[in-house]
């Protein structure tokens, strides 16, 4: 483990959870170290990689970089929690091991947060696809009209099957003291949606979130990224996390209304996934029962999975003309892929 560079508390600690990230980890770290106008440290938490990731990090000569090697795989939430526990900075910024940040990102965000008296800040982001295209996720004019991100707006944007990009893709920074005082950490039981629960919890316990309209975070989609496949166990885990969130925090009327929409989206998604499984098994009675119990689940046939679902239905009707159906997972288009409803370009 590299020792801390200096005794002075840095402005920002970048927390980078890394798992088999040898091809991108150095690029991510270098972008963090290149921040202008703020002092930084980078805490890389290796989550039991089987490649050269820890060796590459350990070889970086900059004393601002620290490596923590976990003795067991804890997933992204657990690795980030280990990094937060080791952080020394006033602010904590999570950086994915295959992404990068622009040099002025943290200066802009901290200035925005300090001016608003905020404990949290989010900004815009650019998404770079496999073919090198770069698209801005939100219009700067749209975000300029949103000086602060509120809990109702955040929940509403994270309703499954919405056609708009959701604020859940933003990468917030948090005041470390605020996280400590509120005892906030990532939910290690979640593999999809852990970012959402942390920011929602921070807003629910009174955190103020400033919005920086410029794009300082660069979200890279690459081959080999964790596939964004939405499964029944993911839905059940997110429902359980939301139920725990509701038990912990008292929401105002508007936030409750948005939360009701979000839970309804989960129920529809669950019914839809059950329907797909029943069609795959050629269980007409089960499929009809599910459709009758939750007819709203059928309206999502415009999703990319629709073509697969129709093929499954055709195989059910004409089983002799087709081989056994293959699994047809619902992709994270349900939560809106960063470049649109295309499962080929979504990343974990």
Swiss-Prot record:
Give the subcellular location.
Cytoplasm
Q: Where is the composition biased (Low complexity)?
A: 324-334
Query: What Enzyme Commission number(s) appear in the record?
Result: 2.4.-.-
Q: Which GO terms describe its biological process?
A: polysaccharide biosynthetic process
Q: Which GO terms describe its molecular function?
A: glycosyltransferase activity
Identify the Pfam families for this entry. Answer: Glycos_transf_2
Q: Where is this region: Disordered?
A: 322-348
Q: Which InterPro entries does the entry mention? A: Glyco_trans_2-like, Glycosyltransf_2, Nucleotide-diphossugar_trans
Q: Does the keyword Transferase apply?
A: yes
- GO cellular component terms, A-Z: cytoplasm
Describe the function of this protein: Glycosyltransferase required for the synthesis of succinoglycan (EPS I). Needed for the addition of the fifth sugar (glucose), catalyzes the formation of a beta-1,6 linkage between the fourth and fifth sugar.
Similarity field? Belongs to the glycosyltransferase 2 family.
Q: What is this protein called?
A: Succinoglycan biosynthesis protein ExoO
Task: Please report the organism this UniProt entry assigns to the protein.
Answer: Rhizobium meliloti (strain 1021) (Ensifer meliloti)
